[in-house]
């Protein structure tokens, strides 16, 4: 994130956001990460959650500008992006685990399996 001099958030930056992509990718992947109070590789499954306050605040800010270029169908379906990307990333971690951890960097043998759960 970029902050102003008072410490307020100016914008969220990510290398994925500067290349062409599907709007659900950017929105969904950000929500998957930002609205979860624990890291994606936390083994504390009981603490995994989805913070609706973060979701609503981000969505409001995002749409304040994005509504100018998004299609109505894209706006209507943004809520599904967060679900889709949580599921999709879980499948990617599981596939990498099954394939011998060849894509994602791991810190221990079961790391991608923990991420997938």
Role assignments for model-derived ranges:
Residues 25, 74-78, 107-110:
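Composition- and surface-driven signal marking solvent-exposed, interaction-prone regions
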Residues 15, 40-48, 104-109:
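Short beta-alpha connecting loops at secondary-structure transitions
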Residues 19-26, 50-54, 112-115:
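Short acidic-hydrophobic sequence patches enriched in Asp/Glu that either
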Residues 7, 34-86:
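A conserved long alpha-helix in the C-terminal portion of kinase-like catalytic domains
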């Amino acid at each position: 994130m970029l902050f102003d001099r008072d410490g307020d958030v100016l914008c969220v930056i990510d290398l994925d956001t500067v290349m062409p992509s599907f709007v659900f990718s950017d929105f969904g992947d950000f929500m998957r990460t930002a609205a979860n109070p624990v890291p994606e590789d936390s083994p504390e499954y009981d603490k995994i959650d989805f913070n609706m306050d973060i979701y609503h605040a981000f969505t409001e800010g995002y749409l304040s500008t994005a509504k100018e270029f998004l299609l109505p169908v894209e706006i209507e379906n943004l809520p599904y992006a967060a679900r889709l990307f949580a599921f999709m990333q879980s499948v990617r971690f599981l596939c990498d685990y099954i394939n011998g951890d060849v894509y994602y960097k791991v810190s221990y043998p079961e790391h991608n399996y923990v991420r997938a759960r």
